[in-house]
Amino acid sequence: GPGTFADFLHIRVMDAWVHEQDIRRVLHQSGNEGGPAAQHSIGRFSRSLPMVVGKRAAAPDGSTVRIDITGPVARTFHIATNAGKAAHVDSDVAAASSPICTITLDSNTYVALCCGRQFFASGDPRINFAGDVALGERVMAGFNVMI
């Protein structure tokens, strides 16, 4: 839909960086995995996590899912469900209720899954689960969020 010029530019930064990583992956020449464009892109992808956790994975109401991203762009996201809606919550709020599931993966895997460059397969050694593994696998199966 319609957006601002700033929105357009934010998406272009993400788009250019993702395609750079596509080319690097094909050429087996990693690089620029942790700079400002990578950080910006991972931040943009994180906006879709509530939809993935709440809607696609159908996390139970009142639960929290923690996603730990390691590697060049390390981040931790807590997504909580309440009254049929999911949203990012800060670590203080998340600490009040233990996560029902924790998913740990590196930032390169996170990006490849978010962009639909790779698809989740149960048993993928790059992805670790603690807690409700079935929920974690549903979250990962819904990770393709690239616009």
Where are these regions (language model features)?
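Short, contiguous alpha-helical
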Residues: 1-54
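Acidic/histidine-rich alpha-helical segments that form the ligand environment
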Residues: 9-12, 61-65, 75, 87, ...
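Short alpha-helical "patches" and their helix-cap loops
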Residues: 26-42, 64, 122-135
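A glycine-rich beta-turn/hairpin centered on an aromatic-Pro dipeptide
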Residues: 39-81
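A short, terminal or domain-edge coil/loop segment
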Residues: 40-56, 84-92, 113-124
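A broadly conserved detector of short glycine/acidic/proline-rich loop/turn motifs that flank catalytic sites
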Residues: 69-73, 81-85, 107-109, 133
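Acidic/His-leaning functional-site neighborhoods
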Residues: 74-101
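C-terminal interaction segments
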Residues: 94-147
